[in-house]
Amino acid sequence: MRLHAPILSLLAAAASTSAAGVTGSAEGFAKGVTGGGSATPVYPSTTAELVSYLGDSSARVIVLTKTFDFTGTEGTTTETGCAPWGTASACQVAINKNDWCTNYQPNAPSVSVTYDNAGVLGITVKSNKSLVGEGSSGVIKGKGLRIVSGASNVIIQNIAITDLNPKYVWGGDAITLDNADMVWIDHVTTARIGRQHLVLGTSASNRVTVSNSYFNGVTSYSATCDGYHYWGIYLTGSNDMVTLKGNYIYHMSGRSPKVGGNTLLHAVNNYWYDSSGHAFEIDSGGYVLAEGNVFQNIPTVIEGTVGGQLFTSPDSSTNAICSTYLGHTCQVNGFGSSGTFKQADTAFLVNFQGKNIASASAYTVAQSSVPSNAGQGKL
């Protein structure tokens, strides 16, 4: 039977529609998130259309097939900032956001800063959205995402967020959650970000899963003036449960993550590689269980004294307690050319009981799979 061109076109469109949308499902605390569900996929063609789709009240599956470059769309600002870490060419300088330079760095040299306005504040993402990239094509450049103000049931999958005023602290965050719930961030790549690659807080973000994502800290400008990004992952919400699984956290110099507020973090099967500083920073209110992770070339796995509570899954005997609260025996972490990471607080483990808990593999599985599977285009 010979198919005529109109019929072929219809079949192609149907195949495209059936293939579009979310791949797989969330593990861990955000298990059950559906995003835009079975809504007919939409394909924005302009930055304005993308902003509209993300910010309206409809359930949507939004498919990105190209780079959406926000650079220059909101103009630039030139003003006086400061240089707390010096004026060498590899050092970040700071925007005087909310008088930060004035109030917190009064002795830092003043410098002129010119930044792109679009990067400072991300795109608002409302409830019941799936934002999905096609192949390796879906990129948001020059602007991040904000899942805030009560937004819930959101999936961000297989996209890249890049180039948010990387020279400037306070130049923008890649992904912000604040007063949210049921959010799944999966196979996302972030690179060349001014401030945080991922930030939760200060209001509750409740149930969140971040999986299979690539936080790339390679930069021409950093607060440590060495090409390693300092502002990695900041988890300080007032009532948050965060699953961090299968992520590749690369070339950072600090705060990857910083955990505080009132945050229960399950860090499982992640791969930290190549840091010039520290990975974890745990303040009061941070409750961290770390298992099955790999730390390679991380000189300081944890910064200073733990202000909250930490269970590092130190050995098989100690790890048996996890079966009572997580339903499995915790997996030891693996280390190569890295600092020590050994603490076994157990009082907080009861907080995992009855929750949706991600499965855990041996660290050797993460070691072999995470670098090749994390990030955009690796579904």
Curated annotation (Swiss-Prot):
Pfam families: Pectate_lyase_4 (PF00544). It catalyses: Eliminative cleavage of (1->4)-alpha-D-galacturonan methyl ester to give oligosaccharides with 4-deoxy-6-O-methyl-alpha-D-galact-4-enuronosyl groups at their non-reducing ends. InterPro entries: Pec_lyase, Pectin_lyas_fold, Pectin_lyase_fold/virulence, PEL. Glycans are attached at N128. It is found in: Secreted. Keywords: Carbohydrate metabolism, Cell wall biogenesis/degradation, Disulfide bond, Glycoprotein, Lyase, Polysaccharide degradation, Secreted, Signal. The active site is at R255. Residues 1-19 form the signal peptide. Its EC number is 4.2.2.10. This is Pectin lyase B. It comes from Emericella nidulans (strain FGSC A4 / ATCC 38163 / CBS 112.46 / NRRL 194 / M139) (Aspergillus nidulans).
